[in-house]
């Protein structure tokens, strides 16, 4: 049986990593990379050969080839208080509000600006204070529509919606997503989206026309642990894993029970290039 290092080198020139066909092999490599200090995000050793794992493998091989003794090129995840202070600084620069009262949730999407669609390669960060203690949760999500809509079906004749980065104050509330289950729904205020209508399957950030209004850009879930976005998102912000979404919604319910029925939630979408801490 190959060691994790041998698996990495065996797949050095195989972009698709075809030999790594079991989650146990992938998990073994992930554990090895984490032990060397590589940042796989909060996904950790989940057995899923995602983009962060592939990037970490590439970085490890590059470091070895350059004689760098496998020094990781990805930064480690900062401690909660450091992360919170960095977000506060970003919000101040952008004139965004940062919520500091008990159980007021700062819900923050971090968009990876890779134009390749159909991956859960973005992140949703929740920061809040509870009983004077700071808390942070981080979840894998997509902030972009999937190829099922980008290439095939346009719900709006103007094009598929891609939520524009910005802060949407009090635009969300707890409600039913498509009448099926509790989610955060965009019913309290307008949002601005780009319209991508060329059906080329790539995400056209900042190149299309913009559209502002009520489009049902909800925050909801995909499947139990989805790999591809496909038709899970037509512009919504969508959790990769159901268990993460359930935890998030329970937190929103707890917030509402403290702040009062009909609590309004603010959603802030940032672009990763402007968030050096992640």
Task: Label each region the model flagged.
Residues 2-12, 16-20, 75-78, 82, ...:
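Long terminal regulatory regions of eukaryotic proteins
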Residues 233:
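Local cysteine-cluster metal-coordination motifs and their immediate loop/turn environment
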Residues 240-241:
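Cell-envelope and extracellular/periplasmic
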Residues 1-3, 51, 190:
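A detector of low-complexity, intrinsically disordered, Ser/Thr/Gly/Pro/Ala-rich segments
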Residues 69-230, 244-265, 271-274, 278:
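Cell wall/extracellular polymer interaction/catalysis modules
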Residues 9-74:
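Short acidic, glycine/serine/threonine-rich helix-capping segments at coil-helix boundaries
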Residues 3-8, 31-34, 220-226:
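Short amphipathic alpha-helical segments, especially helix-boundary/capping motifs
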């Amino acid at each position: 049986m190959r060691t994790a290092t041998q698996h990495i080198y065996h797949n050095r020139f195989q972009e698709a990593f075809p030999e790594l066909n079991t989650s146990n092999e992938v998990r073994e490599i992930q554990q090895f990379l984490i032990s060397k200090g590589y940042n796989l995000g909060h996904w950790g050793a989940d057995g899923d050969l995602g983009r962060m794992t592939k990037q970490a493998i590439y970085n490890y091989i590059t470091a070895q080839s350059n004689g760098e003794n496998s020094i990781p090129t990805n930064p480690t995840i900062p401690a909660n208080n450091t992360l919170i202070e960095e977000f506060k600084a970003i919000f101040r620069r952008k004139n965004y509000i940062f919520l500091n009262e008990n159980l007021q949730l700062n819900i923050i999407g971090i968009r990876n600006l890779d134009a390749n669609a159909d991956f859960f390669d973005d992140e949703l960060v929740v920061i809040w204070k509870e009983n004077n203690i700071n808390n942070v949760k981080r979840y894998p999500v997509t902030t972009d529509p999937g190829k099922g809509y980008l290439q095939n079906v346009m719900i709006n004749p103007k094009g598929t919606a891609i939520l524009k980065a910005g802060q949407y104050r009090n635009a969300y509330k707890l409600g039913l997503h498509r009448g099926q289950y509790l989610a955060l729904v965009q019913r309290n205020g307008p949002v601005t989206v780009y319209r991508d209508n060329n059906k080329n399957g790539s995400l056209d950030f900042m190149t299309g026309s913009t559209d502002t209004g009520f489009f049902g850009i909800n925050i909801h879930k995909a499947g139990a642990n989805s790999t591809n976005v496909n038709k899970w998102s037509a512009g919504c912000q969508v959790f990769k894993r159901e268990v993460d979404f359930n935890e998030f919604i329970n937190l929103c319910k707890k917030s509402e029970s403290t702040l009062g029925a009909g609590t309004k939630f603010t959603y802030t979408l940032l672009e990763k290039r402007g968030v050096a801490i992640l």
